[in-house]
């Protein structure tokens, strides 16, 4: 009799850059869990079909990355409270009754990584660039840290305004046009995927000062294009999304397996692996 190994995956497009299989393989080894975790490309307009096929083939759970987080939100039969508020899902799990529950662990991953770097969020002036699913997923956890203000800006201003309106009852949040921002912020978070293409958001470099911390949700070998730009314009610190990735992955693993892996050791291994490429 052959024992079936539980299957997990990450869906995205592009997905070649993903380190999720590496992370979850290390998590499994660390916690003595038997599972397989793969990276899967889904067509830009074909996430639902790909996810249905995965779960029909006895997939247990999956992570979801750009550009499918809002598709996953609509795909799930049930949502956790934080996923419902985020309006985006980065983790899906097949329940015993066959239904699919959607969760969002991005915000927890981001906040824990910022705090790990000793970034002070309480009383800080925070700028979030981008107003897609990645941004919406982290706003409530950021507001829970009690910043003095949280500003959202986006290429399409109406999307930023919609997000600000959605969360206005949760804390001091405002939306601003990219072209009107000329002041510096304490914490600048780039939630767009521009760095994957070596591009920059159309916002003034005046957002950075010698007291600023830049955080790019994207990651790569060395500085991302956004963080390089931040450092060139005086930002004191610049962090990429690798720690956020490990943090949200640990939350996902906990949802799937009921065990919380240690993130610090895995992050060190991942950074070493990434820089060695």
Swiss-Prot record:
Entry keyword annotation includes Oxidoreductase: yes
Binding residues for shikimate: 18-20, 65, 90, 106, 219
Entries under InterPro entries matching the protein: Aminoacid_DH-like_N_sf, NAD(P)-bd_dom_sf, SDH_C, Shikimate_DH, Shikimate_DH-bd_N, Shikimate_DH_fam, Shikm_DH/Glu-tRNA_Rdtase
Coiled coil (residue ranges): none
A GO biological-process term: aromatic amino acid family biosynthetic process
Chain residues that bind NADP(+): 81, 130-134, 154-159, 217, 241
Superkingdom of this protein's organism: Bacteria
EC number: 1.1.1.25
GO MF term set: NADP binding; shikimate 3-dehydrogenase (NADP+) activity
Catalytic residues as annotated in Swiss-Prot or TrEMBL: 69 (proton acceptor)
Catalyzed reaction equations: shikimate + NADP(+) = 3-dehydroshikimate + NADPH + H(+)
Pathway membership: Metabolic intermediate biosynthesis; chorismate biosynthesis; chorismate from D-erythrose 4-phosphate and phosphoenolpyruvate: step 4/7
Keyword NADP: yes
Entry-linked Pfam families: SDH_C, Shikimate_DH, Shikimate_dh_N
Stored Gene3D superfamilies: Leucine Dehydrogenase, chain A, domain 1, NAD(P)-binding Rossmann-like Domain
Subunit: Homodimer.
PANTHER family for the chain: BIFUNCTIONAL 3-DEHYDROQUINATE DEHYDRATASE_SHIKIMATE DEHYDROGENASE, CHLOROPLASTIC, SHIKIMATE DEHYDROGENASE
Function: Involved in the biosynthesis of the chorismate, which leads to the biosynthesis of aromatic amino acids. Catalyzes the reversible NADPH linked reduction of 3-dehydroshikimate (DHSA) to yield shikimate (SA).
Family note: Belongs to the shikimate dehydrogenase family.
UniProt name for this protein: Shikimate dehydrogenase (NADP(+))
């Amino acid at each position: 009799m052959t024992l079936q190994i539980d299957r997990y995956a990450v869906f995205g497009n592009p997905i070649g850059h993903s380190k999720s299989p590496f992370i979850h393989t290390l998590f499994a080894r660390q916690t003595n869990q038997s599972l397989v975790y793969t990276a899967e490309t889904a067509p830009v307009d074909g996430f639902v079909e790909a996810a249905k096929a995965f779960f029909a083939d006895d997939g247990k759970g999956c992570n979801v990355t750009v550009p499918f987080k809002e598709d996953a939100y609509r795909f799930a039969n049930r949502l956790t409270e934080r996923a419902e508020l985020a309006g985006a899902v980065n983790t899906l799990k097949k329940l015993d009754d066959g239904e699919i529950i959607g969760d969002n662990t991005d915000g927890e991953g981001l906040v824990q990584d910022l705090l790990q770097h000793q970034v002070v969020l309480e009383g800080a002036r925070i700028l979030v660039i981008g107003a897609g699913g990645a941004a919406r997923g982290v706003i409530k956890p950021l507001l829970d840290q009690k910043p003095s203000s949280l500003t959202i800006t986006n290429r399409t201003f109406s999307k930023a305004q919609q997000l600000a309106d959605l969360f206005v009852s949760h804390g001091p949040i405002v939306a601003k046009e990219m072209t009107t921002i000329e002041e510096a912020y304490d914490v600048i978070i780039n939630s767009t995927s521009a760095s994957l293409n070596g591009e920059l958001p159309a916002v003034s470099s005046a957002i950075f000062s010698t007291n600023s911390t830049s955080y790019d949700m994207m990651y790569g070998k060395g500085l991302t294009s956004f963080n390089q730009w931040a450092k060139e314009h005086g930002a004191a610190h610049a962090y990429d999304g690798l720690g956020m990735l490990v943090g949200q992955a640990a939350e996902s693993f906990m949802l799937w397996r009921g065990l919380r892996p240690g993130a610090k050791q895995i992050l060190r291994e991942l950074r070493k692996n990434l820089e060695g490429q």
